Regions:
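Conserved N-proximal alpha/beta basic substrate-recognition cap immediately N-terminal to
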Residues: 30-39, 43, 51-159
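ATP-grasp fold ATP-binding core
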Residues: 133, 161-182, 201-213, 291, ...
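Glycine-rich phosphate-binding loop of ATP-grasp-fold ATP-dependent ligases
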Residues: 147-148, 166-191, 217-218, 240-258
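Phosphate-binding site of ATP-dependent enzymes
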Residues: 165, 188-244, 295-307
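A long amphipathic alpha-helix within ATP-dependent nucleotide-binding catalytic cores
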Residues: 201, 243-303, 341-350, 354-359
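ATP-dependent carboxylate/phosphate-activation module, predominantly the ATP-grasp catalytic core
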Residues: 221-275, 311-337
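C-terminal structural cap/anchor segments
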Residues: 285-345
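Peripheral (often C-terminal) accessory segments that flank ATP-dependent C-N-forming ligase machineries
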Residues: 328-371
Length: 371
């Protein structure tokens, strides 16, 4: 029987932006990957393995799994070469993670082809989110946000940003708030350098009008056999630059109610978004996928941005979905957060559930504060 092996590679967006398979993660990303490597155990299928960095991590996964009645086990890199009949499930796919696994002794025939990796990269380009926006717009009468525009010339980008103060300029391959410039003052040298550098590396930029934010949320999917299955909803907070801060943890119904209380047509738009994911992505992609969305105020009317970005990978929203639905005590709610501390962490925090281990050299951890 084929066994699934999950692994956490949070630098995958950066690897896709780099292209090819020779990307080397910066030290902070490597440290985050090592400290949070146990995170997939919270959404992995029963009976699966989770790749962890060392024996201490493996022992934590095994003991936590046993305590909670899971059937998840940890596996260290030196055991990968023995995986003769395994299916690999990274946080996200790219040529980089494929080469890393082969370097660790994984047989190439167990991994997606190079052509499949290139297809994932092409699907991850933000212009596909424009196609998705149009797909949804053609199938609903709901008031939606303006569709982003793609430019390959700096003067066009500058003209857009000048006409729309507070707009967001985004690199085609980026995610989680990375590769995004909030153009408050587009006439600066800094803005010009950033845009021209991005155009040189990625050939185009996507420009979006800034919106009066009410609520950030996402629909979380799993794509399999050409179809998208809705796993649930995530509600999160992002900072001024659209980077993820924290997420609400609760049941699927609780999260639905939060969104629907501000936007009753959620029930009507969800099937349309699901259809768009199946149509644009699921035919050529298998795995987790998150569609970030936004409710915003436009002259007193609540409107929807149906596709802020699409993440072809697992997301923190997938984690909060699974934990809220299957792990948290019934009726409980909490807040999920990834935190960095140079001095380390204490495990005695009241009403806090740690989702990753606290070891002597831990600098990053994932946890839920209840209540």
């Amino acid at each position: 029987m084929t066994q699934r092996i999950y692994l956490f590679n949070p630098d995958n967006d950066l690897a896709l932006a780099h292209g090819g398979g020779h990307y080397i993660a910066p030290p902070f990303a490597q440290k985050m990957q090592n400290d949070l490597c146990a995170l997939p155990m919270w959404y992995a299928e029963p009976g699966s393995l989770v790749l962890v960095s060392d024996e201490a991590m493996r022992e934590w996964v095994d003991s936590t799994s046993e305590r909670l009645g899971f059937t998840i086990k940890g596996i260290t890199p030196d055991s990968l070469a023995k995986a003769n009949d395994a299916s690999f499930c990274p946080w996200g796919w790219s040529g980089t993670i494929k080469k890393r696994l082969i370097k660790r002794g994984v047989k190439a025939h167990l991994l997606p082809s190079d052509a499949a990796m290139e297809q994932v990269r092409l699907l991850s380009h933000r212009r596909n989110s424009i196609a998705m926006h149009h797909f949804i717009q053609e199938r609903t009468s709901l008031p939606l946000s303006p569709v982003p525009v793609e430019y390959d010339d700096f003067n066009e980008v500058l003209d857009f940003a000048t006409k729309h103060p507070g707009s967001y300029i985004k690199m085609p391959w980026s995610g989680s708030g990375q590769g995004v410039y909030h153009a408050i003052e587009p006439g600066t040298i800094e803005f010009e350098r950033w845009c021209k550098g991005a155009l040189k590396r990625q050939e185009s930029l996507l420009c979006e009008v800034g919106l009066d934010r009410i609520l950030d949320f996402a629909l979380e999917f799993k794509c399999e056999n050409g179809k998208a299955e809705l796993l649930g909803y995530s509600v999160f907070e992002s900072d001024f630059h659209s980077q993820y801060n924290s997420g609400i943890v609760g049941s699927k119904q609780h999260l639905y109610d939060i969104i629907a209380s501000k936007f009753p047509p959620l029930h009507d738009i969800t099937p349309t978004v699901t259809e768009s994911v199946s149509h644009i992505y699921a035919a050529n992609y298998e795995g987790f996928l998150g569609v970030d969305m936004l409710l915003y105020n436009d002259g007193g009317t609540t409107k929807l941005n149906p596709c802020v970005e699409v993440n072809l990978r697992a997301t923190m929203g997938v984690v909060t979905c699974m934990v809220g639905e299957h792990i948290l005590p019934k009726g409980s709610v909490g807040r999920f957060k990834i935190e960095y501390s140079k001095s380390g962490f204490h495990t005695s925090q009241e009403n806090r559930i740690y989702l990753t281990p606290i070891l002597p050299d831990t600098k990053y951890c994932a946890y839920i504060d209840l209540g």
